[in-house]
Amino acid sequence: MRQTKTGILLANLGTPDAPTPEAVKRYLKQFLSDRRVVDTSRLLWWPLLRGVILPLRSPRVAKLYASVWMEGGSPLMVYSRQQQQALAQRLPETPVALGMSYGSPSLESAVDELLAEHVDHIVVLPLYPQFSCSTVGAVWDELARILARKRSIPGISFIRDYADNQDYINALANSVRASFAKHGEPDLLLLSYHGIPQRYADEGDDYPQRCRTTTRELASALGMAPEKVMMTFQSRFGREPWLMPYTDETLKMLGEKGVGYIQVMCPGFAADCLETLEEIAEQNREVFLGAGGKKYEYIPALNATPEHIEMMANLVAAYR
């Protein structure tokens, strides 16, 4: 009996190819055209997206990307490539491909890369620790579209999320401990997750529950009292209500109430990106300090640290 050859597909959101208005516009158009991300009526959404949002937001967002751009590309791309390469070194007999829901490299190119290696089983690991229809669901949809065009379909193992995986929780906890040791223990540890519209949760997306699970498990691993750990949601977009409490409003409130020192971690981001390095590490620092806070530290994402790569290897091992 022929032995199954397994490949691993690491999936993440994506990034513009360059910090320019043109590249950002292409990326945002693809991202914001996905019904998993914005499910507004197309008759209403297309004119707003093409006539208002893309022309106005693209130049502004391009400047933000330029402020965090690295020699090898956007932070998300640099760290994602490092993750892919490190996992491939950790699992030398297993092909590892990287694909993005939006932009390059595409999920389709990643699938084709693995099929060219003659794999007959693919383990798909969306690098979103907490499931949401707008992220993991988008990977699932695109994968289904890709495979619908293939004459032969490999076996697929799809990892829904890993919000309470103990290797993941331990890696987060060790990162927090290292930050506390380096910068001193704060008055409060704030865990900021990417938000989604409240309506999505009301309609069945269990993302907020998965975020609460990670928060509870991490606080337990750290042995921290509940009042010393707070969960918030960032990056809201548009006018409808998103998951609350909002990160920026919470930081402003805490600064005004006299909380002096906060450390912030974003457990939902497997790799640092615009939303962590610019929005959290810079914009929200200014919000907190401007409201009266005294000290603010951002705890980096796990990125391609050895402990994170070992977690990935252990996670996919159960499906190989």
UniProtKB/Swiss-Prot annotation:
Pathway in which the depicted protein is active: Porphyrin-containing compound metabolism; protoheme biosynthesis; protoheme from protoporphyrin-IX: step 1/1
UniProt keyword list: Cytoplasm, Heme biosynthesis, Iron, Lyase, Metal-binding, Porphyrin biosynthesis
Chemical reaction(s) catalysed: heme b + 2 H(+) = protoporphyrin IX + Fe(2+)
Binding site for Fe cation: H194, E275
Keyword check for Protein biosynthesis: no
CDD domains: Ferrochelatase_C, Ferrochelatase_N
Any one biological process term the GO annotation gives: heme biosynthetic process
Chief location bin: cytoplasm
Subcellular location: Cytoplasm
GO CC term, one of those recorded: cytoplasm
EC numbers on record: 4.98.1.1
GO MF term list: ferrochelatase activity; metal ion binding
Subunit structure: Monomer.
Function, as annotated: Catalyzes the ferrous insertion into protoporphyrin IX.
Family to which the UniProt record says this protein belongs: Belongs to the ferrochelatase family.
Name the UniProt record assigns to this protein: Ferrochelatase
Upper taxonomic lineage: Bacteria, Pseudomonadati, Pseudomonadota, Gammaproteobacteria, Enterobacterales
Gene, per the UniProt record: hemH
